[in-house]
């Protein structure tokens, strides 16, 4: 039996300069959904430019709790979270290239 896939809390940079936080168990698939307008309503109106950071969680419940906590934070705290994650995160840009931030 396969082990359950981990869940990811991710932070997107949107074209208008805003951030969008979400969770998924397949980060690449979810980012592509956001890019193609089949993701969240917010990213249909404010298309993403890149995944700024992500953090892995063992299950959906813990990822959801972390997402709620991150969404309640002001922009400055989201930036601090981003900086804390940046050392071990891959960044996915809209042109599908992968770079480290």
Curated annotation (Swiss-Prot):
PROSITE patterns referenced in this protein's UniProt entry, alphabetically: GIY_YIG
InterPro entries per UniProt: GIY-YIG_endonuc, GIY-YIG_endonuc_sf, UPF0213_domain
Residue span, GIY-YIG domain: 5-80
Compositional bias per record (Polar residues), positions renumbered to this chain: 83-101
Disulfide bridge partners, by residue number: none
Recorded family membership: Belongs to the UPF0213 family.
PANTHER family: UPF0213 PROTEIN YHBQ
Protein name (database record): UPF0213 protein XOO1228
Annotated source species: Xanthomonas oryzae pv. oryzae (strain MAFF 311018)
Highest classification ranks of the organism: Bacteria, Pseudomonadati, Pseudomonadota, Gammaproteobacteria, Lysobacterales
């Amino acid at each position: 039996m396969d082990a359950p896939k981990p869940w990811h809390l991710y932070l997107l940079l949107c074209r208008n300069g805003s951030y969008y936080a979400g969770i998924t168990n397949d980060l690449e698939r979810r980012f592509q959904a956001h890019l193609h307008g089949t993701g969240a309503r917010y990213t249909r109106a404010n298309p993403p430019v890149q995944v700024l950071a992500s953090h892995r969680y063992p299950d959906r419940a813990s990822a959801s709790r972390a997402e709620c906590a991150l969404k309640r934070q002001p922009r400055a705290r989201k930036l601090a979270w981003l900086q804390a994650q940046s050392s071990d995160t891959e960044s996915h840009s809209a042109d599908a290239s992968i770079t480290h931030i």
